[in-house]
């Protein structure tokens, strides 16, 4: 999965961000799936990363995508 998705960060937008938001929602978050990587997506991502034992940097890179799998 990780190789199929680009690195995403605050300010990113598009279909890949929608996929990230959907994955976070499957992990228990309640994000609007709007394709915009705003503050709510960043906060949810950082919380997810923290809970998963990763450095909570708010960037969806290969480790985050692999964990969200």
Q: Where are the language model's segments positioned?
A:
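Sec/Tat-exported extracytoplasmic proteins
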Residues: 24-28, 33, 49-56, 68
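Conserved hydrophobic/aromatic packing and binding residues within compact polymer-binding modules
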Residues: 45
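Short hydrophobic/aromatic patches at helix-to-coil boundaries
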Residues: 63-69
């Amino acid at each position: 999965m990780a190789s199929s998705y680009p690195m995403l960060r605050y300010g990113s937008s598009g279909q890949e961000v929608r996929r990230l938001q959907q994955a976070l929602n499957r992990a228990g978050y309640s994000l609007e799936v709007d394709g915009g990587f705003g503050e709510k997506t960043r906060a949810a991502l950082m919380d997810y990363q923290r809970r998963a034992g990763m450095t909570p940097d708010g960037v969806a890179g290969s480790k985050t995508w692999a964990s969200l799998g």
